[in-house]
Amino acid sequence: MSRSLKKGPFADPSLLKKIEQLKGQSKKPVIRTWSRRSTIFPSFIGFTIAVYDGRKHVPVYIQDDMVGHKLGEFVPTRTFRGHAGSDDKKTGK
């Protein structure tokens, strides 16, 4: 289910505050955040945001085609280690 249009998009207030403070600077440092639920706004373009995946912060460079998506969509939380291998030593034909 999508979010109601009446409510509008959500972004963590502390993240918005950090973006606005760094907007005029030429050097843009990496912004660390735990807010995977925040929607990417057009003002985020050009920033690198390190999103927490439960273990570490993964840097994500924000581009214009990411606007409208959530930060958590670009950082997977689960590591796929592969399926169990087949035993070729089974007795058979």
UniProtKB/Swiss-Prot annotation:
Gene Ontology annotations for the cellular component aspect, listed alphabetically: cytoplasm; small ribosomal subunit
SUPFAM superfamilies: Ribosomal protein S19 (SSF54570)
Keywords associated with the record: Ribonucleoprotein, Ribosomal protein, RNA-binding, rRNA-binding
Any one Pfam family match given in the protein's UniProt record, by short name: Ribosomal_S19
GO MF annotation, one: structural constituent of ribosome
PROSITE patterns linked to this entry: RIBOSOMAL_S19
NCBIfam families on file: rpsS_bact
Family: Belongs to the universal ribosomal protein uS19 family.
PANTHER family: RIBOSOMAL PROTEIN S19P FAMILY MEMBER, SMALL RIBOSOMAL SUBUNIT PROTEIN US19M
Functional note: Protein S19 forms a complex with S13 that binds strongly to the 16S ribosomal RNA.
Protein name (database record): Small ribosomal subunit protein uS19
Gene: rpsS
